[in-house]
Curated annotation (Swiss-Prot):
Protein's name according to its UniProt entry: 3'-flap repair endonuclease Xpf
Activity regulation annotation text: Nuclease function requires interaction with the PCNA heterotrimer. Inhibited by SSB, even in the presence of PCNA.
Coiled-coil segments: none
InterPro entries: DNA_repair_endonuclease, ERCC4_domain, Restrct_endonuc-II-like, RuvA_2-like
Amino acid sequence: MVIRIYADDREKASGIPELLKELGITVIFSQLTVADYVITDDVAVERKSVNDLVNSVFDKRFFDQISRLSEVYRFPILLVEGDINDIRKITEKWRAINNALISATIDYDVKVFYSRDKKDTAEVLKKIAEKFQFGENKSNRISLHNKAKLESVSDIQLYIVESFPNVGSILAERLLLKFGTIQNICNASISELEKALGSRKKAEDIYKILRTHYSKTNLDNDSKKTTSLFDFL
């Protein structure tokens, strides 16, 4: 059983990726524009120390990050690291932090987890990965081939866009609202796709797929290399 977790390059300095490796986890670094850790196609984690949590709320980064996290991933997670009681020591406006966490849960459907320290964070990430990569939740994904009858043009458009790698129903709707038509999505640049997708790698993958000529050779090679959508990350 090999657990793989994608980590943002900026997380190297935290030391958590090394702790994950000590737990037997394969860590793959990438430039993530949304989230700090990607567990599966649908699950991602934004890690914040207590200090960073407080600062991000007051400098307006918090809700932008949480909003993008919930738009890109079906199961977004905020992991708060450190003693939550320290918030009262850091700021007199601690109620604003509590309200932000409540809003993240209720308004953005973000799950909020807590860890004592970096070592505990690594343990929490491992447990999340075990649940979603190998546990009962592994099969809890939307299958593109088990949908109800498509009765409208909008349904068909969503169906087509959802077939792109790492694009679920929420992100498919976001792409269509941003670009208007499937043709415009196909004509978009990598930078334009990245802004909508929240990931440079995903944008490059979709851009390549849309512009690569179909051939039996490509199909055979891809079937040997790729076993799941997670491999496209």
